[in-house]
Every structure is written in C-alpha cells, then in structure tokens.
From Swiss-Prot:
<dbReference type="Pfam" id="PF04187">
    <property type="entry name" value="Cofac_haem_bdg"/>
</dbReference>
<feature type="transit peptide" description="Chloroplast">
    <location>
        <begin position="1"/>
        <end position="75"/>
    </location>
</feature>
<dbReference type="Pfam" id="PF11891">
    <property type="entry name" value="RETICULATA-like"/>
</dbReference>
<dbReference type="GO" id="GO:0015995">
    <property type="term" value="P:chlorophyll biosynthetic process"/>
</dbReference>
<dbReference type="GO" id="GO:0009741">
    <property type="term" value="P:response to brassinosteroid"/>
</dbReference>
<feature type="transmembrane region" description="Helical">
    <location>
        <begin position="519"/>
        <end position="539"/>
    </location>
</feature>
<feature type="compositionally biased region" description="Polar residues">
    <location>
        <begin position="714"/>
        <end position="726"/>
    </location>
</feature>
<dbReference type="InterPro" id="IPR021825">
    <property type="entry name" value="RETICULATA-related"/>
</dbReference>
<feature type="region of interest" description="Disordered">
    <location>
        <begin position="714"/>
        <end position="735"/>
    </location>
</feature>
<keyword id="KW-0812">Transmembrane</keyword>
<keyword id="KW-0217">Developmental protein</keyword>
<feature type="transmembrane region" description="Helical">
    <location>
        <begin position="582"/>
        <end position="602"/>
    </location>
</feature>
<keyword id="KW-0472">Membrane</keyword>
<keyword id="KW-0809">Transit peptide</keyword>
<keyword id="KW-0934">Plastid</keyword>
<keyword id="KW-0150">Chloroplast</keyword>
<comment type="function">
    <text>May play a role in leaf development.</text>
</comment>
Length: 735
C-alpha cells in the first residue's frame, strides 16, 4: 500500500496546518493548529482542529472507511498534536521573552589604579634577632608594618662625623612613612635635635611659608655650611607635604654652660626646665656608668676615678636627654591617640644598650617601650646579640651608597632559591661558596647563575673559567655582546678597508688580511677587559705571595672595570678611581695591541713567504717591502690604549649598562642601540687606524702606474725590506 500526500506543513506565528498522508480508501485528514495569542477573547489560544475534507473528485465508493485507516489514524493524530503543541509553546515563550525587556547588566566599576610602591635600595637589618643581625629581603612590608605600629620612631644618626648618607636615609624613611600615614589617616611629625627648642617659632614660620630657607639658615649660623645643605631637602619636603617640624634640641646657651661649668652653672629656673628632678635615678646612673668606664680603661689609676671633662660631658648628656624627652612627650600628647612622631637625633641618645639610660628608657614611664622603635642609620659595627641581652636597636638601616663587606642579603631568600633549584652549596664554585658564607651573593645573582647553567656550553664556561663566570654574573648578556662585536668586526673592517683603499684593495690584500685578523683578536679583548665583573674572593685570598704583590692586586681590584661602571654591592668609586680605571684599561689594551701586532705582522710575513715559495715568479715580478714589527706594535698599542680604550669604555659602561638599565622594559630597543653603536664604533675605529697607519708611515697608498709611464729597471738583488709595510712593485725592464 503506497502512501500519498495531499499537502505540506504550513506554519506561522498564528496557525499551522498540514495534511496527513492518505492511503487508499482513507478519508483526507487535515490537521490545523491555531496559535493566535493576539486574540484576547479566546479562552484557549492553542486550538487543534481535525478536519475531514471531501473533494469533488472523490467518488462515494472511495469514502469507505477501512479497518486499516482506523488503526493508523490515532497514533498519527497523537504525534501531530504533541509536535504542534511544542511548536506553539516555543513560539509563545519567544514572544514573551521579546515583550519583557531584559534588565541592564550591572558592570563593576574598574578597580582603582594600584600605586606602584617606591623601590627601597637601602639595606635593612633586623637587630632584634639573636646572633648576627638578619638582612631583610626585597619585601620590606614587615618593616613598614612594624614602624607604623609604633608611636615614636627614633632615627639615630652619626654624631662625631655626620654624613650625607644619613640625611638621604632620613628623607627616604619620612617620605614612605608619610605616604602610609595618609592611607591610615594619621598625622606625621618630625622632631629634630639639630634645632634648639627656642627656634620653634622660626620653624613654624618656615612651615607656614612666612620665612624662606635663607632666613631660617641665618638662625643656625653655628652650623657648618655642608650641614645646612644636607638638611635642606628634608626640611623642604616636610614644608611642602605638611609634615610638622618640631625643635627638640637643648638651647645652645644652656648646653655650653653645662659643658663648661656643669649643672651648677645653670640658674634655678633653667634647672627646672632642663634637668631631671631629684630622685629620678638618671644622674646617678650616668655617674656610675662614667665611673665604671673610667675604671675599666685605667685600672692603675683608681685614685682619680674620672676626670672633670668626662663628668661634665656626662652632665651635658643628661641635660640633652631630659630636654628631648620632655619635648617628645609633649609632641606625642599634642598629636592625639593616632599621631606618629619621628625623632632625628644622635645614635648615642637612642641606643637601647645594657643600662637603658637613653631616650626610650626615659619616655617609657609615660609611653611603653613597645610603642617606641629605634633605627640606627649606617652604624659602623654590627654587634652579635646573645641570649638574655637587649638588642642595640630594632633595625639597622644602611644607605645603598655605603659599602657592604658582609651579611648583605637575606639568607632565607638565598635558601629558598637554592631549594627551588635543587642545588647543594658544596657543588657550587669556590668563589660563590665564599660569597654565600659572607652574605655577598644576592638572590638575583644566584638565580641568574642557575639560569645560565641550563645551557651546556655556558655551563661549561662558568664552571671552568672564573673570568667568564665573573662577567656573566655581572652581565648575563656578556656573551651576546661578545658575539655581536665579533660578528660585525670582520664585516665592518672589510668595508672600511675597501672605503679607504678603493682600487688598491686587492693589491694591498696583505694589509687587509693583517688588519682583519688583528681586529678579530683584539675585539675580543676590547669587550673582555672593560666588561664589569662580580667577584666574591678578595685578591689577597687568591694568591700566597709577597705582600707587595698582594697590595698591588688589591689596588687593582679596588679600581672599577670601566670609568662609567655602576657601583656594585654598595661599593663607592671616587672620581680618582674612575680616572685610574681609564689609565689601567689603556695600559691593558696597549699590551694587547703590542702582542697582537707581533703575531699579526709575523703571520703576514709568513703568508707572503709561502706565496713566494708557491709562485717563484712573484719574487721576480713582485717583491714586497715589509715593515719592522716593533714599530707596528708600538703604534697599534698606542692606538688601542687611547682611542679604542675610551670608545669601548663608553660603550661598556655608559651605553650598555647605564642607558640600557633605564630602558630595561624595552629589550628590543636596547639590543638595537647596542648593535648600532658597536657597528658605528667598529667602522669609524677601523678608519681611524688606517689614517694613523698612513700618517706614521706604516702604510702608504700605492700610486697607480699609467700606461704611458716607462717602467724602471731594477734587479731582484736591489729589493730590500723597507721601514714600511707597503708592498712596492719591482717592474721588469721592458725590452
């Protein structure tokens, strides 16, 4: 029985209908689904209608309903009903979704820009730990948190020999504390012992900008000139940023009276203001301390326990501490419960010590010691703290410009780098082990060393040759710079040779070969010698020889590798040392030039001899007049020691380190600058050498013989070696 169809599926948003397949003897059935949701008067918009159509061309005999048609019709009706009900539900859902407006998507506001924290280049040590003070790593967050938890922060600076480095640290600390105090809505004040308290009104006028720096300077005329220059940046910063300035020093008149006559020389009113009350224990404490110190230093002169000068100085110390303590307590009270006070004074006034007779001990009766924190700036010594002893301070803070010979980096960070790399200390080279023992190897340097060892060739060089290791640790791109220099050396040398020699290029080929080989060898040393190095073994430890040799090697080790090199590890190089580096570097390159010239000219002579042996006719038709090697060596050595030395020192120190460090975020630009500078240096340097060689007679440009010139007759026996490296032609007689 073959089915036939009368129609297809007719679908729209309002209604859908189609005809069921009709078999023989079956009535034509059309299914219609009405989905008109716009008619509100219909109780049910989804209507399914089954219609029996009678066609005019159907006979009455064909309308008979068979048993098979009755059995097939119900399942077809059920399937059609479920199909169109799902279609109508989807259409109604789509219509309702369109009619209901979606709520606007709430966009989160962009996060506020995170202010980049100022990099701290100074070195900080935690002096509160047992044993040797522990260097704090790059993350100084714990230090700042501890400082902010204190109400009073003492900055103890050098008293006998004040340095500019202390003022740099003070400005750095005040600047960072102010930034954090603003975030926590705290008022920051700065108390200065250098200003006597009777100058407070002048400081107020300076803060209100009613007085300029020159007028304020006139009130401290007893200061040395350099002292005002050191304090001026700190004072200007406080005035411009609203950090209150407080004078806490003892008036000069009172201090000089005590130093000359003692406390007895003060008037009754001055004693009440500047001396501690009777029974406080501080005067007796100082007396006993002075007495015991004198007895220990002079055990054989116990009849005179202490001299009058030490006694008067102790009394002056009492007056200074008492005066500052009173001003500090009052300033803390004026600052409220959240204010913060930074006190800049001499280190002897704030050290904790064994007796605790300084400012923290005096103020601890009103302000607990846990709210006071002591920072010593650039102390000369680092004391080992034993169990049961009080620390000398909470932190030791060193300027980045101060040299560091021990315990310079956080040993905990070093251990983390070692563990992450899976390396053992005894498997490292001896100089790095020595540096780890002294605390001179930074985590970054150690990580760079492990990264370099991932390459087999570089690992072999760093393990076997200390010179390569020292240069790669100081500059991981040293081999790249060396490869660039050697790659462009041959090319630029040949181009410059051709530019200068033109049509005589092939006639003067021996000159070209000599200069090219010599340039390739010398370029290695011009990159090697001025390159910065990083060594952890002193010269005295490397050799066991006479003291004079050790002293000479130590002197050479104290000179920078180039005049523009940055200070490494806090080592400060003076102008005289940088000038000495130019002289020493010139002597080294001059020696390289002399040795390379002997080798290059000797090889050129050997090459010519071999060429003459292979082609004997060259000895008749072309006889070379060779130059003495000594003159060439001296001229070339002088050229390297002057022109090349200065040019390569500028490239190594100024271009590839100082400028490259400023552009470290753009490595492609840095490499392009290095490449362009080295190409230009090699090209113009070669031209300078050619001009110098010709001006000194080492090389003279050949004259080209024209066709109408008559060649001069000369015999082979008359051809001798001249004092130039010029190859002259012995022309045969034109018979």
């Amino acid at each position: 029985m073959k089915p036939t169809t009368n129609g297809g599926l007719l679908a729209s948003q309002s209604s859908s209908s189609f005809s069921f397949p009709r078999f023989r003897g079956q009535l034509p059935i059309i299914f219609s689904a009405n989905n008109n949701q716009k008619k509100k008067n219909l109780p049910n918009p989804n209507v399914v209608t089954l219609c029996l159509h009678s066609h005019s061309n159907v006979s009455s005999s064909q309308i008979a309903v068979t048993r098979r048609a009755i059995l097939v019709a119900p399942p077809l009706l059920a399937a059609a009903a479920s199909l169109f009900l799902s279609i109508s539900s989807a259409a109604s859902a789509e219509t309702s979704a369109e009619s209901v407006a979606l709520p606007p998507v709430a966009t989160a506001p962009p996060p506020p820009p995170v202010e980049k924290e100022e990099a701290i280049t100074s070195r900080i040590y935690d002096a509160s730990v047992l044993g040797e003070p522990m260097a704090v790593g790059k993350d100084k967050k714990r230090v700042w948190e501890k400082l902010l938890n204190a109400r009073i922060v003492y900055l103890g600076e050098a008293e006998q020999v004040p340095t500019r480095d202390d003022k740099v640290l003070e400005l750095e600390i005040v600047r960072n504390l102010r930034k954090r105090c603003i975030e926590s809505d705290r008022q920051l004040s700065l108390a200065l012992e250098a200003f006597p308290l009777d100058l407070q009104e002048q400081l107020n006028q300076y803060m209100d900008k009613r007085m300029d720096g020159e007028v304020l300077k006139s009130y401290v005329s007893h200061w040395p000139v350099q002292r005002w220059q050191e304090y001026e940046p700190l004072l200007s910063y406080c005035r411009d940023n609203g950090v209150k300035l407080i004078a806490c020093g003892t008036p000069l008149k009172v201090l000089r009276t005590v130093q000359a006559e003692g406390i007895r020389g003060l008037s009754e009113s001055e004693r009440k203001l500047y001396t501690p009350p009777a029974g406080s224990g501080f005067i007796s404490g100082f007396t006993s301390f002075s007495r015991s110190s004198s007895l220990n230093m002079n055990p054989l002169t116990q009849i005179v326990p202490f001299g009058p000068s030490s006694y008067l100085s102790a009394q002056a110390r009492v007056v200074e501490d008492h005066t500052m303590s009173q001003v500090i307590v009052q300033a803390v009270a004026d600052g409220g419960g959240t204010g913060m006070l930074v006190v800049v004074t001499g280190a002897n006034h704030v050290e904790y010590g064994s007796r605790g007779t300084g400012l923290p001990a005096r103020i601890s009766r009103k302000i607990p010691k846990k709210s006071q924190l002591v920072v010593l700036l650039d102390p000369e010594r680092q004391f080992l703290r034993k169990e049961g002893e009080s620390p000398v301070a909470d932190f030791l803070w060193y300027s980045a410009a101060r040299p560091c010979s021990r315990n310079c980096f956080d040993r905990a960070e070093i251990a983390r780098v070692m563990n992450a790399a899976g390396r053992r200390r005894d498997a490292l080279p001896q100089d790095i082990q020595k540096g780890l023992d002294l605390g001179l190897v930074s985590p970054e340097i150690l990580q760079n060393f492990f990264d370099l060892e991932q390459y087999p060739l570089i690992s072999e060089l760093t393990q076997r040759f200390q010179g390569f290791r020292e240069r790669l640790l100081a500059d991981p791109k040293f081999l790249n710079r060396l490869a660039i220099e050697e790659a462009i050396s041959i090319t630029t040398t040949l181009v410059a040779q051709y530019e200068k020699r033109k049509e005589n290029f092939f006639e003067e080929l021996d000159y070209v070969i000599t200069d090219s080989v010599r340039a390739s060898v010398v370029d290695f040393f011009t990159v090697w010698l001025p390159a910065p190095t990083l060594s952890f073994i002193s010269y005295a430890d490397e050799t066991i020889g006479p003291n004079s040799i050790d002293a000479l090697r130590g002197l050479l080790g104290s000179i920078p590798d180039n005049a523009f090199q940055k200070s490494l590890g806090g080592q400060e190089w003076t102008l005289s040392l940088r000038i000495a580096s130019v002289i020493i570097g010139g002597l080294k390159l001059a020696g390289v030039g002399v040795v390379s010239s002997f080798a290059a000219v000797g090889s050129s002579n050997a090459l010519y001899a071999i060429r003459k042996f292979i082609k004997p006719e060259l000895g008749v038709g072309e006889q070379a007049k060779r130059s003495p090697m000594l003159k060439t060596a001296l001229v070339y050595g002088g050229y390297l020691g002057t022109s090349s030395n200065i040019r390569y020192q500028i490239i190594a120190g100024l271009i590839e380190h100082r400028i490259s460090d400023e552009l470290s975020s753009q490595p492609l630009l840095v490499n392009m600058i290095s490449f362009v500078v080295r190409v230009a240096n090699s090209y113009f340097g070669t031209q300078q050498w050619i001009d110098l060689a010709r001006s000194t007679g080492l090389q003279t440009q050949k004259s080209v013989t024209t066709s109408n010139q008559i060649p001069e007759v000369a015999s082979q026996s008359t051809v001798e070696y001249s004092t130039t490296e010029e190859a002259s032609m012995d022309d045969l007689k034109n018979q």
